[in-house]
Amino acid sequence: MTQSLILDPLSSCPPLQIAGFDIRVLLSGNDAQAVEVFLTTGKEGTGPAPHSHPWDETFFVLRGSIVFGIGTHENSVGPGNLVHVQGGERHWYRFGDEEGEFLSFTSGKAAAAMYRELGALESNAPKTAYKAVAIRHGQESR
């Protein structure tokens, strides 16, 4: 059952360290009916490999520059920019020359569970372990 809430993400949402960047689950499918919300922080050059998943994903850049690849297009965006990726579309991102941060919003209830499982992997886990978790949650490497 979901309920309204107010939270302080830095004190109530510990970061999950995934492939060199941190993701805080602000709102999961356990808290809301149709959306999940995340705060992601990353150092220069970090970000996921090209992938797709069945859920929509929307990013709102808070600080730093971030390069987003969607399909065959690449764009560098900064604070105040919004990027929306339709479910099923190939995409990726890389943090630019400085530490960056964005909010992301996903449809459905799958992303938070995937991030929590990825965050539980050892920091030196092989890429195949990350890939196996992602596949279990409906994400495909592309």
Predicted regions and their residues:
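Ligand-binding loop in jelly-roll beta-barrel domains
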Residues: 31, 67, 79, 87-112
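A hydrophobic/aromatic-rich effector-binding and dimerization subdomain
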Residues: 103-129
